[in-house]
């Protein structure tokens, strides 16, 4: 195998990426999420492909085709719920992966980081369009509310919304195009992942210490392949437990009611992984302001390399910054909770406070704390 690994043009690329790749000797389990995201993407493409074989992207039959998949197709229920819960796992790993990047200062690899943010937007768009496809109440009203936000764009807004809808409301044309985009986007994501890895391999991996690891590297295989397989097995355990024991735990019961344009659900909300951004959107009374805050809540990630004021890369030896990061995590959990609550007191004011603190922690508190830590270390 070694004889073939080095000279073969295709296997050589795989060899340099996954076998003989020099990796830092001290990377922790927080570095497992990249490979887990790759597995999730593959799983989503495979299950999605089988679902697409039986799904019909038509308003009259979409809901019943999903029911047909669950009832009549061999293991259709398993494929459907593995796909739905696989998306939840995907986002859990994405948020862990981003959190790890922030904690250990991995954002200083700016090219890799920026491609990662583009990937996040692409995955979010894919998940949103996928949520529309079962054509339940929450699918329909979620699509209506979120696409309608674009009407806040000055001058071109209303025309843009109608152009996306393919008519004057969310209807057959909208569903068909959402299915087309939902099908093609994962392949675009796969291409972006390749670029993400390409940029990463230009610099090599970061490590928990934040120091240059070139003096102490080990081959990726067998050390990290075994470690990744352990992560994979744990992921499958969680995913299968979720899929087989409580497949609807993270879903919305309203989506088991067929879409009805004449009946608005009492509380329209997206899937749990978008609730933090949805809470930020709702906490601003102005429509355009809300949309800008929503977009900026994700785009703010691009500012991390610029806002890094510390003389150290990682937060490993910076307890004050660590406290702030965990405060940010707690804040995001509060935002997620608020996003799922009705728009009434006290949830409105809690959401507004959490939104203000989200932006102020990132834009003001983290950079100033880093400067203070530099002073404390007499740097």
UniProtKB/Swiss-Prot annotation:
Residue numbers binding heme b b562: 83, 182
Cystine residue pairs: none
Keywords: Electron transport, Heme, Iron, Membrane, Metal-binding, Mitochondrion, Mitochondrion inner membrane, Respiratory chain, Transmembrane, Transmembrane helix, Transport, Ubiquinone
Membrane topology qualifier: Multi-pass membrane protein
Recorded GO CC terms: mitochondrial inner membrane; respiratory chain complex III
Domain of life from the UniProt record: Eukaryota
Keyword presence, Mitochondrion: yes
Task performed by this protein: Component of the ubiquinol-cytochrome c reductase complex (complex III or cytochrome b-c1 complex) that is part of the mitochondrial respiratory chain. The b-c1 complex mediates electron transfer from ubiquinol to cytochrome c. Contributes to the generation of a proton gradient across the mitochondrial membrane that is then used for ATP synthesis.
Subunit description: The cytochrome bc1 complex contains 11 subunits: 3 respiratory subunits (MT-CYB, CYC1 and UQCRFS1), 2 core proteins (UQCRC1 and UQCRC2) and 6 low-molecular weight proteins (UQCRH/QCR6, UQCRB/QCR7, UQCRQ/QCR8, UQCR10/QCR9, UQCR11/QCR10 and a cleavage product of UQCRFS1). This cytochrome bc1 complex then forms a dimer.
Comment field (misc): Heme 1 (or BL or b562) is low-potential and absorbs at about 562 nm, and heme 2 (or BH or b566) is high-potential and absorbs at about 566 nm.
Protein name per the record: Cytochrome b
Species assigned in the record: Thrichomys pachyurus
Gene from which the chain derives: MT-CYB
């Amino acid at each position: 195998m070694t004889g073939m690994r080095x000279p073969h043009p295709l296997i050589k690329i795989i060899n340099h990426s996954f076998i003989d790749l020099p990796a830092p000797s001290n990377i922790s389990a927080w570095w497992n999420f990249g490979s887990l995201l790759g597995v999730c993407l593959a799983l989503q493409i495979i299950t999605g492909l089988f679902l697409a074989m039986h799904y019909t992207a038509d308003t009259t039959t979409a809901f019943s085709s999903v029911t047909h998949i669950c009832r009549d197709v061999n293991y259709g229920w398993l494929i459907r719920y593995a796909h739905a819960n696989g998306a939840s796992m995907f986002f859990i790993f994405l948020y862990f992966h981003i959190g790890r990047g922030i904690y250990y200062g991995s954002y200083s690899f700016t090219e890799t980081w920026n491609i990662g943010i583009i990937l996040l937007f692409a995955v979010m768009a894919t998940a949103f369009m996928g949520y529309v496809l079962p054509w339940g109440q929450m699918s329909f009203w979620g699509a209506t509310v979120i696409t309608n936000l674009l009407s806040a764009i000055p001058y071109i807004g209303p025309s843009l919304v109608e152009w996306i809808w393919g008519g004057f409301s969310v209807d057959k044309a909208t569903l068909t195009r959402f299915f087309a985009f939902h099908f093609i986007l994962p392949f675009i994501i796969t291409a972006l992942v390749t670029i993400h890895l390409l940029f990463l391999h230009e610099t090599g991996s970061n490590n928990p210490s934040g120091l240059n690891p070139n003096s102490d590297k080990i081959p990726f295989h067998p050390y990290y392949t075994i470690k990744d397989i352990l992560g994979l097995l744990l992921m499958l355990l969680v995913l299968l437990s979720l899929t087989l024991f409580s497949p609807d735990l993270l879903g919305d019961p309203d989506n088991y009611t067929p879409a009805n344009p004449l009946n608005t659900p009492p509380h329209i909300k997206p899937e749990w992984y978008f609730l933090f951004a949805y809470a930020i959107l709702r906490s601003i009374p102005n429509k355009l302001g809300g949309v800008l805050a929503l977009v900026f809540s994700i785009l703010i990630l691009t500012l991390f390399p610029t806002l890094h004021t510390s003389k150290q890369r990682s937060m490993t030896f910076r307890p004050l910054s660590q406290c702030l990061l965990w405060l940010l995590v707690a804040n995001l959990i509060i935002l997620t909770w608020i996003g799922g609550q009705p728009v009434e007191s006290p949830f409105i004011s809690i959401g507004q406070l959490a939104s203000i603190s989200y932006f102020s922690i990132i834009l003001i508190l983290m950079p100033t704390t880093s400067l203070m830590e530099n002073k404390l270390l007499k740097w």
